[in-house]
Amino acid sequence: MGLTLTQKILSAKVGREVKPGELIEVDVDMVLGNDVTAPVAIKEFEKIGIDRVFDNTKIALVPDHFVPNKDIKSAEQVNIMRKFAKKHGIVNFFEVGQMGIEHALLPEKGLVLPGDVVIGADSHTCTYGALTCFSTGVGSTDMAAAMATGKAWFKVPEAIKFVLKGNLQKWVSGKDVILYIIGKIGVDGALYKSMEFTGNIKALSMDDRFTIANMAIEAGAKNGIFDFDEITEAYVKGRAKREYKVFERDVDAEYSEVYEISLDEIRPQVAFPHLPENTRNIDEVGKVKIDQVVIGSCTNGRISDMEIAYKILKGKKVHPDVRLLIFPATQEIYLECVKRGYIEEFIKAGAAVSTPTCGPCLGGHMGILAKGERALATTNRNFVGRMGHPESEVYLSSPAVAAASAIAGYIVSPEEV
């Protein structure tokens, strides 16, 4: 049998064909850490007792979870990163003012490219598979080892193929597609497998693909990965500062399962507490009142997400009982929002607009929920206590549903505002 897209990339790194279940060691093209995970990795790295990192251009340190520093502990965490970056001449350390949410920032800067093998000490490192690379999350100890050796080990995953057909309806986006898929297969439906997306992927923008790959981990996947096409090429062109290699799956590649997804049939989705698999069509949600709406995160903080929110919010007001928080994912996206007039309209509508940060997504800061409060968010997880008090609730949706709901005061379709 032939090789899947993930097998093709890993085989090229190993220098021979690899099979699912094999344990392999490969050279990595990028090692990533943030202000939660990198300080732990740095301490482990220093225990190894070597003088330098394997390559100061292939490590990215991005403080994004608790920045701008929310307290003394978070300030100390970032300072560990800052000192390490200076000591080892880490080229890709992003200080406050340059940083963004890591999984939006690295593709934007051209630091992850097609054909790469990327590891990050953050579970949503799988985002970069939208660019036809193998990327996956690891622990801080694996990050430390990779910073020292430039290598990582994996068990080669089996793969599931998702064949996309048709086109998206109005107000339906990549977020709705991935919530629909997770609702279909469950949070363990792709456990330690590669989710490979093919078919009519031209129906999806690059931002849609980032969103879908980002949430592959919410189905338990090792990685999510898209075919390379002209949309991928257009995104990478002008960003890539080094050569990259495009891989294609074999026509006779073996998959553990194959799903056909009819994009035409997908309506806006909402994931109910407390798992991303608890999805319902917007028409089946009912009148769920909300206290807070969050638009942003590594899942939905890109310029197209901001544009959708702008189109819905323009000339309208946020419901008086709702707090609307908007987080452009990077400084570049924030600046583009300013240039296009989005920020002005957000503020006129009654939203609070923040510098890039993960903020409330992980219950960090800038939008923590109190007991009994309910939020609708464009983030990727809605576990118990994820955004604050254990007795609060988080619902997940697209930016379109989130913006419309902020106006209505309850979860609603964009068609209704």
Swiss-Prot record:
Superkingdom in the source lineage: Bacteria
Cofactor(s) essential for the protein: [4Fe-4S] cluster
Keywords of the record: 4Fe-4S, Amino-acid biosynthesis, Branched-chain amino acid biosynthesis, Iron, Iron-sulfur, Leucine biosynthesis, Lyase, Metal-binding
Any one GO molecular function term: metal ion binding
GO biological-process terms attached to the record: L-leucine biosynthetic process
Pfam families (alphabetical): Aconitase
Reaction it catalyzes: (2R,3S)-3-isopropylmalate = (2S)-2-isopropylmalate
Chain residues that bind [4Fe-4S] cluster: 298, 358, 361
Binding partners and assembly: Heterodimer of LeuC and LeuD.
The protein's name in its UniProt record: 3-isopropylmalate dehydratase large subunit
Organism, scientific name: Thermoanaerobacter pseudethanolicus (strain ATCC 33223 / 39E) (Clostridium thermohydrosulfuricum)
